[in-house]
Design a protein with these regions (language model features):
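A conserved short beta-strand
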Residues: 149-159
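Short alpha-helix in the alpha/beta-hydrolase fold that links the catalytic acid
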Residues: 187-197
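Alpha/beta-hydrolase fold nucleophile elbow
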Residues: 122-133
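Short beta-strand/loop motif that positions the catalytic acidic residue
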Residues: 177-179
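Acidic catalytic loop of the alpha/beta-hydrolase fold
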Residues: 182-186
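Gly/Ala-rich beta-loop-alpha elbow adjacent to hydrolase catalytic centers
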Residues: 132-136, 140
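Serine-hydrolase catalytic machinery in alpha/beta-hydrolase-like enzymes
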Residues: 24-121, 221
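C-terminal catalytic histidine-bearing segment of alpha/beta-hydrolase fold enzymes
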Residues: 199-247
Length: 247
């Protein structure tokens, strides 16, 4: 994936086509700088918060944000690692994600800070859905368990395990899980266990599997990309947005 700074000129050109131009947003959470990406086609657009995978915020998330803006949604792609931190080595990716897995309160604070930043840019965070990929999917479920007042939580090939001592008793919005049944990183046993937890907690949820799809099946150009599963899951996600948000 290319770095976020590499694609801003291209993004400004593509944004003109649908009347919205995205921009980098530098913001602070607890004294540390973060760099997200915000795009909105109108002042009253429903809002979507996007959480990146373990590569950090790159052109992949920006492309997804622009795709949603074309459909009429305001999108803030947040940053969980820090301004300029876009790991490319496996050990660095594990380090940055591991730090947040070990410090769930920090993870929650960063997501809250991102929502506050989006609100300051004009986003309607009371009419909002959050979604994420891989590590970002795990963060989405962390936000759901925190009791965040959002209308929906969606994950693509995201982490599904619930940390010890946590549950979904405070979850407010509906949960949508999209998972590859050939994913060896996040197993079907974990998928099944999450289904049991959500059912027990009485959380409205929908969980979909895609046959033959491996982990990261939505990543364009990746060696595990599966076009059919990507298109089907994206279609279902956009339907979920239309069903969940006030347009």
């Amino acid at each position: 994936m290319r770095y976020i700074t590499y694609v801003f000129l291209l993004l400004s050109l593509t944004g003109v086509a649908f009347g919205a131009t995205g921009a980098s947003v530098t913001y602070q959470v607890n004294g540390q700088s973060y760099e997200g990406y915000y795009i909105s086609p109108s002042d009253r657009a429903p809002f979507v918060l996007l959480i990146h995978d373990w590569d950090g915020l790159t052109d992949y998330e920006i492309k997804r944000a622009n795709m949603l803006a074309e459909l009429g949604y305001a999108v803030f792609a947040l940053d969980l690692f820090g301004a300029g931190v876009r790991p490319t080595e496996m050990k660095d990716k594990r380090q940055h994600t591991g730090e947040l897995y070990k410090n769930r309160e920090k993870m929650r604070a960063l997501m809250k800070g991102a929502l506050d930043t989006a609100k300051s840019k004009g986003a309607d965070i009371k009419n909002a859905v959050v979604f994420g990929y891989c590590f970002g999917g795990a963060a989405v479920l962390e936000l759901a368990r925190s009791g965040a007042d959002l209308k929906g939580f969606a994950t693509f090939h995201g982490g599904l395990k619930t940390p010890q001592g946590q549950n979904y008793s405070q979850t407010r919005g509906e949960i949508l899980i999209m998972h590859g049944s050939a994913d060896t990183a996040i197993t079907m046993d974990q998928f099944t266990e999450l289904a049991k937890e959500l059912e027990s907690a009485g959380v409205a949820h929908e969980m979909i599997t895609y046959g033959g799809a491996q982990h990261a099946f939505t990543v364009f150009g990746g060696n595990r990309y599966q076009e059919a599963a990507d298109k089907k899951s994206w279609k279902r996600f956009t339907e979920f947005l239309a069903e969940t948000l006030n347009n």
